[in-house]
Amino acid sequence: MLKELRPAIVILVALTIITGLIYPLAMTGAAQVLFPYQAQGSLIEQGGKTIGSALIGQSFTADRYFHGRPSATTAPDPKDASKTVPAPYNAVNSMGSNLGPTSKALADRLRQDVATLKAQNPSAAVPVDLVTASGSGLDPDISPQAARFQVPRVAKARNLPEAEVETLIDSRTEGRDLGFLGEPRVNVLKLNLALDRMAASGQPR
């Protein structure tokens, strides 16, 4: 019996060592050497402190900053653990809204969000990504159109020329991956950090 089982046991042990130890360590080591920034989570630092990741969005609400997409993520209610409360961009609980196209709650939220945005920029059409949440609730990017829609509000709040803010958006716009995958996008956290630097120095960066 043991003789018949030995090949299976040897293969099991060998594959466990190869796929569970050697391969993960080799890939981790290669990533640390070839792509250290990405391997560490694409973390963004400022003043020696980690302030976020380029891969996970953050909730910006002040007029002086660009805002990301709506986020449907939640967190446990501190008053009642059996319930949840809205917690935008909660990376511990990635999720979408799960509201279907016929949902009244979704329609009401969309109408409210569109009205709020139109009040900020009445002459422009509201970009769809500014009123729709991503499937993960953690999308760090918005479209260039969504960024430009917010220029009047941001420029007014910071007392900056709109042309300079638009130039900053252009400099921070990333193209399609490999030239054909996805859509052009702007990372909201990186854009806001560049905006802070521009305001501090008086020059676009």
Curated annotation (Swiss-Prot):
Keywords: ATP-binding, Cell inner membrane, Cell membrane, Ion transport, Membrane, Nucleotide-binding, Potassium, Potassium transport, Transmembrane, Transmembrane helix, Transport
Signal peptide: none
Molecular function GO labels: ATP binding; P-type potassium transmembrane transporter activity
Any one of the GO CC terms: plasma membrane
Top-level lineage group: Bacteria
Pfam family, one: KdpC
Subcellular localization, as worded in the UniProt entry: Cell inner membrane
Coiled-coil regions, chain positions: none
Transmembrane segments: 7-27
Topology relative to the membrane: Single-pass membrane protein
InterPro entries in the record: KdpC
UniProt record similarity statement: Belongs to the KdpC family.
Summary of the function given for this chain in its UniProt record: Part of the high-affinity ATP-driven potassium transport (or Kdp) system, which catalyzes the hydrolysis of ATP coupled with the electrogenic transport of potassium into the cytoplasm. This subunit acts as a catalytic chaperone that increases the ATP-binding affinity of the ATP-hydrolyzing subunit KdpB by the formation of a transient KdpB/KdpC/ATP ternary complex.
Subunit: The system is composed of three essential subunits: KdpA, KdpB and KdpC.
The name this protein goes by in its record: Potassium-transporting ATPase KdpC subunit
